[in-house]
Every structure is written in structure tokens, then in C-alpha cells.
Amino acid sequence: MHHQLEKHYVNRVGWLRAAVLGANDGLLSTTSIVIGVAAAEPERNIIILAALAGMIAGAMSMAAGEYVSVSSQEDTEKADLMREKRELEEMPEIELRELAKVYEKRGCTKETAMQVAIELTEHNALEAHARDELGINEITQAKPLQAAIASFGSFAVGALLPFTVSLIAPIKQMVYFQYGFSIVFLMLLGAISARAGGASIKIAVLRICFWGTVAMGITALVGHLFGVNVS
């Protein structure tokens, strides 16, 4: 009998969060920039330049911010692991009892918890403490470069749509074309991310469409009233 491995959505949390955030931000922020500029009725080359600048600056900003944020998390994890390693060397018996207590709190009897702690300590003490005491494992472990690349790429991909629309859409209908294409792709992106994460597609689509409309509506209003470009 063949057993199929279960799909666990938590395995996707790290890269999915960065990718969805980047794509949403790239699409929505760049579209909002273009709509804000287009509402002031400028020339096409100004709209294209605004879209390109928004795409490049936004992608770099997302990547840098994600790298710094996840690097801080990684530094904290490394410090915790170093401290745990030192404690295992200096007071192994105390650490063994601490590990056993973790399993007791999860429902094991005192004897079973101690036996599990002993066996896992013999196998790999630091790994056992990192996983079960600190909550650090290969799935949730911080990966700064991976997160930064995902954010940069996803932002650029998201921003590519409004940039492309700015090249081909009629100037007088630019705002409507940008809004229409962006809402459709925001709905698609929301549905994909919800399905990949095991969440409700309907709620995800409604949420992303609502906030997308709010963001684009505000920039269109500001651009129309004041004739300025806002992001």
C-alpha cells in the first residue's frame, strides 16, 4: 500500500508570505503611482518614468527591508543556539530535565518524557533543544537571502503589469485601464495565495479588492485635486 505524504501549509509560510507581500505591494503601489500621475493628466513619458522608478525603487526597498528584518531574526536564533550549546556543555543534566519537562507539558508521562529526552539527546542534543525548546527548525528557520530574493522578484513581477499597461493604454483612459487590469490580477493573486495557504479564497479576494480599490482611489483623488504624484 502506498502512502502519500500529507501537504502541510506551514512548509510554505516563509516564502509564501514574502512572495505574496511583494507581488501585492508591487502591483498595488506601482498602479497607485501611475493612477495618481495619470489623474493629473501628464504626458505618457512621465507616466512610464513614474512606473519604472516605482518598480525599481520598490523592488530594492522590499528586498533590503526583508533582508534586514529576517537577518535580525537569524541573529537572534544564532544567539539562542550558541547559548543553548554552551548550557548543554556546562550543565547537561539540567538541560536534559528541561527537555523532559517540555514533553511532559505536551502530554507525556514523566517516565516517557524522560526516556524521549534521553534518546533525542543521545541522537542530537542541540537539534532536540532547538526544535522542541526554542522552536527553531529547518522549516521555520530564518533565511535572509531567500526572503530578500523572493521579495525583490515578486515585487518586480507585480509591478510589471502597471508598467506594461502604462506603455499601451490610451492616455485619456489610463486610470480606468490601470484600475481594471490591477483589480483582475489582484483577484487572481488573492485566489492563488489563498489556495496555496489553505485559506478561504472568497475572503482573500474580497479583502485584497477592497484595500486595492481604497489605495488606488485615494491616489487618483489626490492626483486629480492637487496634480501631484504620490506613492
Task: Set out the residue ranges of the language-model regions.
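Juxtamembrane boundary at the C-terminal end of a transmembrane helix
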Residues: 220-231
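Structural signature of hydrophobic alpha-helical transmembrane segments
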Residues: 172-185
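Alpha-helical transmembrane segments of multipass membrane proteins
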Residues: 57, 61, 158, 162, ...
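Transmembrane alpha-helical segments and their cytosolic interface motifs
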Residues: 15-33, 138-164
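Internal alpha-helical transmembrane segments
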Residues: 1-69
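Interfacial loop-to-transmembrane junctions
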Residues: 188-213
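Residue-level signature of catalytic and energy-coupling elements of molecular machines
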Residues: 25, 64, 103, 113, ...
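Cytosol/matrix-facing amphipathic helices and coiled-coil assembly/linker segments
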Residues: 1-11, 70-152
